[in-house]
Every structure is written in structure tokens, then in C-alpha cells.
């Protein structure tokens, strides 16, 4: 009887202990899930400042400001704070070292790069056992092969995803593509196969692509990112892989300008990032600068060619301040010609380019400089370079010129090769606004932008590294639309800026602008027009 009672009491104690254990596991898992949602999951909202818990953890508003560091165990003593650490994990011991370090150092997250499957499950179980001690972001990364692709050094996707989902699911995935040659880009079949693997995931996924191939791979990568707002991009490099070691600032900018900025992270050496951050200021997207996704919401002011109007403009709400630049002859033979803000036929002004840039550069407004002659380009760009190097330009800068002959006129533009060469040699970190000379004939016999016109323009623009916008005359847009669509499709770095003369004497219909609005991407067409012609 006593033995039976002991067995019963033992069973009760065991059941109680097991219940407590399971309750502890449940609470720990719940807490982990909450922390995972807080630290790891990335959701796109309307307000940029709350898009990413990664950004929230580091108290940042923009991934461009996040610091990454590739490190080995020998770097443990020198790894700094406020950064994501990308570390290769080859054993449970290595994982323990980095987890311990992340707990000690303020504001450090871990990106765990697994190079083989043998340690993955062991490390995931170890993460699960220590989940209550994890108070920092953890990303689990593997370079994966899909559909039995034979990619040297890659993990098999099916096994990689299965191990994580069944062992430690409350984590952020990161999957990478390993280029094995300079032409080994991310192709459409790869991203479609990857999407089949990840489309039912509850957690966010980072796609990691080498900087050296990101521009050539951009269309399929962008397609994948558009499938879900829970998919994010990390552009990276690898010093150990020759084909992944090149970093172009303008390739990074090309991608950044074509997405909401919160969706692109940069695991790039700080030396490259410093140059990139500077380029992203003057050659960055005005939409990023103002926190918009709709180019029609950008507002403009024109012909700011004297000090009085300049001061009025600074007090106004216009986002873009535009002015024409001329080089004026000196009053005496000893003086050097200087660029001023003036629109022909006026050739005098109390506002020169240097003062204009110094005052407008940090005003919170974007700048557009319109050049009517080649002589004023070089001295103006040297001023831009000088002032920008001192931090005096903190907003996007557009450089505009008509470089080709366009509809309804025989007037020639500036020499395209000379104009572009000066920009690329003096200060290339700008958006190029490349247009055609045009006229509007009151007789009504107006033609639009022909296919040869846009093809010639594309031959110039497609060779450029910078973002390019094409200013097109509003009265000619509707009849040219098919050709302009063709032009836009040649590069994701292209946009249109629809303009009309000031004061407007062209026959421009709101209906035509609404047509353009309804048949284009909101981020790809700017409307530099009177308010009554802005489409909704």
C-alpha cells in the first residue's frame, strides 16, 4: 500500500515537474517570439521611421547609417558597438564566443554565416536553449543552391530552410547568391525558385546579393522584393571572393533610389560607405529626402535669379529651387568671369552661383541648376565640389541641360559629350537632367518626341552611372507617350520630369497629365507644372 502510494506521489511530482518545465518552455518561447517580432521582423508601414526593428534596435531611421563588420574570433577584443557583426560559424564553440560577446558589448547584432550543414542544427539547438539570454538581433545566413543547382560552397535550400523552421523558427533568414564569375548574376529562374521556398514563411527574409553583380541582377532581384514587403535586401561584398569584392558607389545608389530606402541594407566596408553616403546626399532621390513615394507631390519654384526672389523662395514651401546659370564677363580685364544666376535675355544679377549654393545648399530644398552654355559648366561644378566637400550641400542636386535637338525646332543643344565629360570629371555625384530643345507652334502643327529622338538620348544616357531624369514638354507628352514609355523601360535609373514654359503659353490639358499619371509608376514621373495641371 505504501509502495503504491509512493508511486502515486512520484507520479504527481513528475507530472507537476513536467508541467512546470513545459510551462517554462512555453513562456520562454513566447518571450522569444515577442523579442523576435521586436528585434528581427521587418514590416513596411507608411511611416519610414518605424519600418524596421533592426533600425529601431540601432536607433536609426535609414539603413545607410547602419555599420556592419566582418569579423573572426581573433577580432573579439576589438569589435566595436553599434553595428551588425557578420561572423562565420563553424562550431558550437564559435557560436558561444560571439553570443557571449554580443551580451557584453552595447548595441551589437549578429549575422551568423553558416558555411556547412554539419554545424547548423547543433547551433540552432544551442540558440533555442539560450533564447532567454538573447536581447539582440540574430540573422541566420546561408548561401543556398536551388533546384539541385551545383554551386560550389552553397548549402541546399530545402535542408537549410527545413532545419531552421523545425529547430529554431523564431529567427530571421538570410539567403545568399555566390557569383562564380563576373557574369554570374542573379537570374529570374533563381529568384522564382527561391520565392517558391519562402513564400509561406511567417518571418522576414533577407536576400543577400554581392555589390559587384547587383546592378546587372536588379530586375529579377527587384521582382522578388516586390512579391512581399517582408523580403529585404542586403548588398554585400566578400574579400575572399574575387567576383564579389568590387563595390561601385553608383551601383549602390542605383538600387537605393529604386526602392523605399528602408528595404535596402548595405554590408559594405566603411571606406566605401563613406563615399556612398556622400553620393546619396547630392545624387539621392528627392522622394527619399522628403519621405515620399509619389513624385507628383514634389513642388517647384523657377527662375530664382535675384536675391529678393531667392529670399522669398526660402520662406516658401517649394521643395525644388530651380535657376539658370550664365557665365558673365568681368567688368575689368583683371577680373575673372564668374557664373551667376540669370535667365536670358537677362545677363545681370545680384545673385551669383557661389552665394546661391551656400545659402540654398543647407536650406532643406533640393537644387536644380539649368545650364544654357558650356562655358558656365566647369566653374559652377568646381564651386559645387568645393561647397559640397565642406558639407555645404545637404540635399539632392540636379544638373540640367538640353543636349539634343527635339520636336518643332532646329535649335541645337549643348555638346553632349563635352557636357557629360565635365560633370563626370569634376563632380559626378548628381542627378543628370538631360533634355531636348523644343518649341510649341501656335499653328497647331506640332510633332512629339519621335522614336529616333528617344533612342539617341538613350545611347547617351545608358552609359552613365548616375540617375537620369528626362525633362519633357507637357504639351508634347501625350502624343509621344509610347516612345517615352520605351525610353523609361531601358533603365530603372530613368525618370521623366514633365515641364511647361513659365509663364505657360502652351496648350496643356489636365486630361493629358491624368493619362500620364494613370499609365506610369508614381515614383517615375515628376510634374513641374502649375498647380491646376497637376494630376491626382
Identify the residue ranges that each predicted region occupies.
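Phosphate-group recognition and catalysis centered on beta-loop-alpha active-site segments
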Residues: 2-536
Amino acid at each position: 500500500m505504501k509502495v503504491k502510494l509512493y508511486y502515486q506521489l512520484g507520479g504527481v511530482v513528475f507530472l507537476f515537474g513536467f508541467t512546470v518545465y513545459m510551462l517554462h518552455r512555453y513562456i520562454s518561447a513566447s518571450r522569444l517570439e515577442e523579442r523576435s517580432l521586436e528585434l528581427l521582423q521587418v514590416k513596411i508601414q507608411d511611416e519610414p521611421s518605424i519600418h524596421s526593428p533592426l533600425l529601431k534596435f540601432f536607433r536609426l531611421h535609414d539603413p545607410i547609417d547602419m555599420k556592419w563588420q566582418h569579423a573572426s574570433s581573433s577580432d573579439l577584443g576589438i569589435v566595436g558597438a553599434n553595428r551588425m557583426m557578420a561572423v562565420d560559424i563553424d562550431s558550437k564553440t564559435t557560436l558561444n564566443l560571439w553570443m557571449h560577446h554580443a551580451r557584453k558589448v552595447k548595441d551589437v547584432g549578429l549575422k551568423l554565416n553558416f558555411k556547412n550543414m554539419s554545424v547548423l542544427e547543433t547551433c540552432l539547438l544551442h540558440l533555442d536553449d539560450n533564447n532567454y539570454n538573447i536581447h539582440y538581433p540574430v540573422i541566420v545566413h546561408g548561401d543556398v543552391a536551388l533546384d539541385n543547382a551545383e554551386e560550389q560552397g552553397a548549402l541546399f535550400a530545402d535542408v537549410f530552410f527545413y532545419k531552421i523552421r523545425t529547430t529554431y523558427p523564431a529567427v530571421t533568414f538570410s539567403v545568399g547568391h555566390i557569383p562564380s564569375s563576373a557574369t554570374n548574376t542573379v537570374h529570374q529562374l533563381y529568384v522564382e525558385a527561391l520565392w517558391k521556398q519562402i513564400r509561406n514563411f511567417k518571418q522576414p527574409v533577407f536576400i543577400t546579393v554581392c555589390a559587384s553583380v547587383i546592378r546587372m541582377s536588379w530586375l529579377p532581384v527587384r521582382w522578388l522584393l516586390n512579391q512581399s514587403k517582408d523580403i529585404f535586401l542586403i548588398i554585400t561584398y566578400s574579400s575572399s571572393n574575387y567576383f564579389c569584392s568590387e563595390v561601385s558607389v553608383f551601383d549602390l545608389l542605383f538600387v537605393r533610389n529604386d526602392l523605399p530606402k528602408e528595404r535596402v541594407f548595405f554590408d559594405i566596408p566603411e571606406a566605401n560607405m563613406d563615399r556612398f553616403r556622400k553620393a546619396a546626399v547630392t545624387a539621392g532621390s528627392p522622394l527619399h529626402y522628403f519621405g515620399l513615394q509619389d513624385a507628383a507631390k514634389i513642388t517647384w519654384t523657377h527662375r530664382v535669379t535675384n536675391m529678393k526672389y531667392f529670399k522669398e523662395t526660402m520662406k516658401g514651401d517649394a521643395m525644388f529651387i530651380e535657376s539658370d546659370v550664365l557665365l558673365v564677363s568681368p567688368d575689368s580685364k583683371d577680373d575673372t568671369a564668374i557664373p551667376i544666376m540669370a535667365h536670358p535675355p537677362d545677363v545681370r544679377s545680384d545673385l551669383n552661383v557661389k552665394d546661391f549654393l551656400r545659402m540654398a545648399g543647407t536650406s532643406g530644398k533640393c537644387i536644380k541648376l539649368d545650364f544654357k552654355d558650356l562655358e558656365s559648366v566647369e566653374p559652377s561644378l568646381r564651386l559645387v565640389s568645393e561647397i559640397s566637400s565642406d558639407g555645404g550641400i545637404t540635399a539632392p542636386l540636379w544638373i540640367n541641360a538640353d543636349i539634343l535637338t527635339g520636336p518643332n525646332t532646329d535649335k541645337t543643344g549643348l555638346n553632349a559629350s563635352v557636357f557629360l565629360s565635365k560633370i563626370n570629371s569634376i563632380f559626378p555625384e548628381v542627378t543628370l537632367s538631360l533634355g531636348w530643345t523644343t518649341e510649341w507652334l501656335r499653328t497647331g502643327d506640332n510633332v512629339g518626341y519621335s522614336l529616333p529622338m528617344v533612342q539617341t538620348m538613350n545611347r547617351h544616357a545608358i552609359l552613365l552611372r548616375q540617375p537620369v531624369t528626362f525633362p519633357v514638354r507637357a504639351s508634347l507628352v501625350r502624343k509621344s507617350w509610347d516612345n517615352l514609355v520605351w525610353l523609361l523601360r531601358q533603365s530603372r535609373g530613368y525618370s521623366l520630369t514633365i515641364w511647361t514654359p513659365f509663364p505657360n503659353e502652351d496648350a496643356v490639358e489636365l486630361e493629358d497629365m491624368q493619362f500620364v499619371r494613370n499609365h506610369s509608376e508614381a515614383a517615375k514621373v515628376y510634374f513641374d507644372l502649375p498647380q491646376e495641371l497637376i494630376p491626382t
